[in-house]
């Protein structure tokens, strides 16, 4: 798996291959909760000696667990990070927030100026700004024409067997990114 973001994900109980140990603060197979040792447990929903929920408790942890009960259906548990990443809401039936889902890659966003990609709406202005800072914008359309030629160091859309493949006319902005510096004294188109 080439997904480095997974390192920040809390492991599931089924991911742990050692036998369950009550009191180690890892929710493992067969445990309803695990808040550590009885001396250290600060979870009012969990019986630290048995790693079971206390009587009347529905849950002991999770983004959709409030005061030992499942959060109401529709309670926001993960906010929207962009137009392409809608907020997630509790189901009212479990303590965990649903998986983070994104709009389909390629769906138009920002008033059709960009397209969703992995939960973001990357547009060239934002990319230029991130690379170069304020006063830098997407260059004029004519600057992207070299991406159709395929003979420049960066002027192509992809490589196949080491050969640079030029961009189709409708894809010229999928190759090299051209930004324009609009600060005083800079007047070139690209």
From Swiss-Prot:
Residues 19-105 form the Disintegrin domain. Its cofactor is Zn(2+). The keyword Flavoprotein does not apply. Residues 1-11 form the Peptidase M12B domain. GO terms for biological process: proteolysis. InterPro entries: ADAM_Cys-rich, Disintegrin_CS, Disintegrin_dom, Disintegrin_dom_sf. Keywords: Calcium, Cell adhesion impairing toxin, Disulfide bond, Hemostasis impairing toxin, Hydrolase, Metal-binding, Metalloprotease, Platelet aggregation inhibiting toxin, Protease, Secreted, Toxin, Zinc, Zymogen. One of its GO terms (molecular function) is toxin activity. Its main location: secreted. This is Zinc metalloproteinase/disintegrin.
């Amino acid at each position: 798996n080439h997904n480095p973001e997974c390192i920040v994900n809390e492991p599931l109980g089924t991911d742990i291959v050692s036998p369950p140990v009550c009191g180690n603060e890892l929710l493992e197979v067969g445990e309803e909760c695990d808040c550590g040792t009885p001396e250290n447990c600060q979870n009012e929903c969990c019986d630290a000696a048995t790693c079971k929920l206390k009587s009347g408790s529905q849950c002991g942890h999770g983004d959709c667990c409030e005061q030992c009960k499942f959060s109401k259906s529709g309670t926001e548990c993960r906010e929207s990070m962009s137009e392409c990443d809608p907020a997630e809401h509790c189901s009212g039936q479990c303590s965990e927030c649903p998986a983070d889902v994104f709009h389909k890659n390629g769906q138009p966003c920002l008033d059709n100026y960009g397209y969703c990609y992995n939960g973001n709406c990357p547009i060239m202005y934002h990319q230029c700004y991130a690379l170069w800072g304020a006063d830098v914008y997407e260059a004029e359309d004519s600057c992207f024409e070299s991406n159709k030629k395929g003979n420049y160091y960066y002027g192509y859309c992809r490589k196949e067997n080491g050969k640079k493949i030029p961009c189709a006319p409708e894809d010229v902005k999928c190759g090299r990114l051209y930004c324009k510096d609009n600060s005083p004294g800079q007047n070139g188109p690209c």
